[in-house]
Amino acid sequence: MTDSKGYAVNDLVWAKMKGFSPWPGRISEPPAELRRITVKKNIPVRCIFFFGSNNYAWIEETQIKPYQEFKEKLLSSCKSAGFKEAVQQIEEFIASPENFQHLFASEQDNRPDPDVEFNKLREGGTESGEETTVNNTSTPAALESVETTPVTAKKSAAKKKVRASLPIKLHVDKVVVFRSVAASTTKARAIGNKAKAAAALNDTSSPKRKRKILNDTAGDVSSLDLDTFSPVRRNVPVSHLLNRPTVARPATPEIDMTSVSNALQSRNIQASNLKFGFLGLGIMGCGMVKNLLNSGHSVVVWNRTATKCRKFQEAGAEVADTPSDVIEMTDVTFSCVADPQVAKELVFGNCGVMSANLVGKGYVEMTGVDPETSHDIAEQIIAKGGRYLEAQIQGSKNQAEEGTLIILAAGERLLFEECQTCFEAISRNSFYMGDVGNATKMNLVLQMISGVMLAGIAEGLALADRAGLQQKDVLEVLELTSMSSELVMQKGNAIIKGEFPPQQALKHMQKDLKLALNMAEGLEQPLPITAASNEVYKHAKRLGYGSHDSSAVYVRARF
């Protein structure tokens, strides 16, 4: 069906959303999540599929123009890379529409005809003589109403009149007839409402009034004559507005156990005679264990997902069933997991570190934790006769595989010396910083600086794109200035490519910012810029980018 302006499903158009240039799109059937969005009453809108970003949105008809007719005029309205990609995609769609059908899978082309469902709604209400209401969670609220006139020969004309006033055809999922089984107070309210409706009809001096079936506010249920009802969600889902151009997380390639990094080959490492354990084979852990094995160390590994241990077992590592088994089988155990909570679970949980005999055993915590967590673990390890060292790592996945990390250690000095051959295999420098807690504080300060700087890079490149500048040119100029660094160039290139391969997960960066803010809170040190950056990372994580690289914070800054 076409609307008053002649638009039909599959028509190609230019659609303008507030804050954006006119964008090439296609008139579409709204997907399920979009039909739940409340739109303004009596304003004709169309569901638009935007090319390039592959999202849907309701757009007012006044902001829609035919694609071919306005093509020459609007092609120069925006110079961003995303716009050019969208134009290229719509031209490819024109040439080969069958190649794009997978993008429209969320559209429900086989929905029942809205006119038929609307007629069923009206006929069911008048024949039963009882109140009817719509229980519809898949369409915008407050867009449908029925006249409270008696059933006469004018019924068909009234239907046409009501349907003509609707800006959008609705898919009525269910019609519920509420029987007279409620308490007397509910019946009285229903009777009172009907009496008011009848009085309004008898008043010939006023025009016919329409009674809304669903309230326009989508939150007030007091006007509905319901015996029972489910709570109405006040927060209407608007996730599609935030789910603008996103990318699927790139698959993490399996680590190549046969290759040896140039940095490791250039070092003359004499492997220690001690036996080392390693808990956690994540993004950073895999690279470190690989270098320990390639440098000749004897290693026992454990990971929550046992399948990750196979490659290391083939390369010469032993595999233990539980963390406590690793402690029993080794002299020194390294732990490198996701966050402080997981680190505590490994120590205090079932079959954890504390379940083993710790007398004379060394435990090295490499997880990014706060000073309080490190102190808690240290106290328990030492209380059972063990030795403790915190060894915080600075670097990325590539640096872990190359063996060029930075190690910040604090705790028992003798244990630090015993681990030197391991630190030589996985890092280019290791620093001993004294008492437990000093290394974690230093690490949080460095992570805070890195996170704030990365958020600034993301916002700068987002502004450049919005201003019509080429992000590649911005990065080339930036490389020539004193602001240039390896971090800036790596993250900048990742943003331009839009791939965000995980070097350091965004959720881990946000975790470190949160821990830095907690530490500052205890010291009464204000960190307003860090706090603002933390909110940006939290939003990006909320959009589903927590497991992507931290450079994916650009998605939040740009969209």
Swiss-Prot record:
Keyword Cell division annotated: no
A cellular component term, taken from the record's GO annotations: chromatin
Chief localization: nucleus
Domain PWWP per the UniProt entry, residue ranges: 9-70
Alphabetical UniProt keywords: Chromosome
Biological processes annotated in GO: transcription elongation-coupled chromatin remodeling
Pfam families: NAD_binding_11, NAD_binding_2, PWWP
Classification via SMART domains: PWWP
Gene3D superfamilies, per the entry: 2.30.30.140, N-(1-d-carboxylethyl)-l-norvaline Dehydrogenase, domain 2, NAD(P)-binding Rossmann-like Domain
Region (Disordered): 106-137
InterPro entries membership: 3-OH-isobutyrate_DH-rel_CS, 6-PGluconate_DH-like_C_sf, 6PGD_dom2, 6PGDH_NADP-bd, GLYR1_PWWP, HIBADH-like_NADP-bd, HIBADH-related_NP60_sf, NAD(P)-bd_dom_sf
Segments forming a coiled coil: none
Record field: compositional bias (Basic and acidic residues): 108-125
CDD domains: PWWP_GLYR1 (cd05836)
GO MF term list: DNA binding; NAD binding; NADP binding; nucleosome binding; oxidoreductase activity
Subcellular location: Chromosome
Binding of NAD(+), residues: 277-291, 511
Record's comment describing the protein's domains: The PWWP domain is a H3 reader and strongly binds DNA. In the dehydrogenase domain, the conserved NAD(P)H-binding sites and sequence similarity to plant dehydrogenases suggest that this protein may have oxidoreductase activity. However, since the active site is not conserved, the dehydrogenase domain seems to serve as a catalytically inert oligomerization module.
Family the entry assigns: Belongs to the HIBADH-related family. NP60 subfamily.
Described purpose of this protein according to its UniProt entry: Nucleosome-destabilizing factor that is recruited to genes during transcriptional activation and colocalizes with a subset of trimethylated 'Lys-36' histone H3 (H3K36me3)-enriched regions.
Subunit description: Binds to mononucleosomes.
Descriptive protein name: Cytokine-like nuclear factor N-PAC
Native source species: Aedes aegypti (Yellowfever mosquito)
